[in-house]
A protein has these predicted regions:
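Active-site-adjacent structural elements in enzyme catalytic cores
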Residues: 1-310
Length: 310
C-alpha cells in the first residue's frame, strides 16, 4: 500500500511540474498531462508524434469535476449513471470560461471527457486539482499499450514515469458518443452500441460520415504493428503468423489465439497484446481468421481494418 501511495505521489509531483506520465486505465495505458496547461499538452503531441489537429480525451474522477468545463445534459446523466466509471467517452459542449488548453480541443467548442475505471488512476485523479488529457501511450498510429512493459517498448526513457496498474481489463479504447449534436456513436469501443441504445431508449448507429467531427482513433491507418495484415483468412500462407479467434489443438508456434471459447470480450482484451507479441517475434506478415461482426466484434473488426491499411 505504501509503495502504491509513493508511486501516486511521484506521478502527481511530475504532473504538477508539467511533465507527461503514463497512467493505467481499463481500456489502454494513457500518456497523461495537465489538461489546463498548454506547456504540458504540447509535450504529449511531441512525444506521440501526433498531429495537433487531433483532439484529446480528458479524464476526470467523477461527474461533479467536469462542471467547470462542460455543459451537462440528461443523456449524459443517464449514461454516466449506467456505465461510469468505464470505457465510454462523451462529447460535450465546452464552457466559455473553461481552463482547458486550446491544444486539447484544437480550438473546437466541444470537449471529449471520460471517467476511467482503474484503482491507481482513480487515486491519482483524486489527488489533483486539474483533469488529465491522456491519449494512448504509444507513437501515433501504432499498437495501443495494455501494460507497463508495452509503454516501455514504445518510449523507453522518454517518459518521466509509468504508473503501473497491471494489464488493462478491457484492452480496447473507449466508445465515443456525441451528445452535443444529433446523438450518435463516433468511435466504436469497449461498450457495445446496443447497450447504449437500451439506456437511451433509441436506436443508435456508428456514424461513418466522412466529414464528421474529428475524434481520436479515426485515421485510416491506426493501431498498427507495421506488419501487413490479411483479414478474414481461412488459413495462413507459409510466411504469415496466424491469429485464431479460438484456441485449437495441433497448431504450431506461428498460430496465436485470442480466446479459449470465442468470448469476444476476452478477444478484445487480448487483441493488442497478441499483435505486439507477433511483432516482437519478428514475423513479417499476419493473417487473421474472420471475427464475428456483432457486439464487441464490431470494435475488434474496426481496429483490425485500420491496422491493416497500408
Amino acid at each position: 500500500m505504501k509503495k502504491d501511495l509513493s508511486n501516486i505521489k511521484k506521478a502527481k509531483y511530475l504532473l504538477d511540474k508539467n511533465h507527461c506520465v503514463a497512467i493505467p486505465t481499463e481500456t489502454v495505458y494513457g500518456l497523461a498531462a495537465n489538461a489546463y496547461s498548454d506547456t504540458a499538452i504540447l509535450k504529449i503531441f511531441k512525444l506521440k508524434k501526433r498531429p495537433k489537429s487531433n483532439p484529446l480525451i480528458v479524464h476526470y474522477c467523477k461527474a461533479e469535476d467536469i462542471k467547470n468545463d462542460c455543459e451537462l445534459n440528461s443523456n449524459f446523466k443517464k449514461l454516466y449513471n449506467k456505465f461510469c466509471p468505464g470505457p465510454l467517452t462523451f462529447i460535450l459542449k465546452l464552457k466559455k470560461n473553461s481552463k482547458i488548453s486550446k491544444y486539447v480541443t484544437n480550438g473546437k467548442k466541444t470537449l471529449a471527457v471520460r471517467f476511467p475505471k482503474n484503482l491507481e488512476t482513480g487515486k491519482l485523479l483524486k489527488s489533483l486539482n486539474y483533469p488529465l488529457a491522456a491519449p494512448s501511450a504509444n507513437i501515433y498510429t501504432q499498437i495501443s499499450p495494455v501494460s507497463k512493459k508495452d509503454v516501455k517498448d514504445e518510449f523507453g526513457k522518454k517518459i518521466s514515469f509509468i504508473l503501473d496498474g497491471g494489464s488493462s481489463k478491457v484492452g480496447l479504447e473507449s466508445t465515443i458518443i456525441d451528445l452535443v449534436n444529433k446523438v450518435k456513436i463516433l468511435r466504436l469501443g469497449g461498450i457495445e452500441i446496443d447497450k447504449i441504445s437500451k439506456v437511451l431508449k433509441r436506436k443508435l448507429k456508428y456514424s461513418k460520415e466522412k466529414n464528421k467531427m474529428q475524434v481520436p482513433g479515426q485515421s485510416k491507418l491506426h493501431y498498427s504493428p507495421n506488419i501487413p495484415i490479411r483479414l478474414n483468412a481461412k488459413k495462413p500462407f507459409p510466411d504469415e503468423a496466424f491469429i485464431l479467434i479460438q484456441k485449437r489443438k495441433g497448431f504450431d508456434k506461428k498460430y496465436f489465439y485470442l480466446t479459449k471459447n470465442k468470448n469476444l470480450k476476452e478477444a478484445g482484451k487480448n487483441l493488442y497484446s497478441t499483435l505486439r507479441k507477433i511483432k516482437n517475434l519478428k514475423f513479417n506478415k499476419i493473417a487473421i481468421e474472420k471475427i464475428p461482426n456483432s457486439g464487441l466484434g464490431l470494435t475488434i473488426n474496426d481496429r483490425l481494418k485500420r491496422a491493416s491499411k497500408r
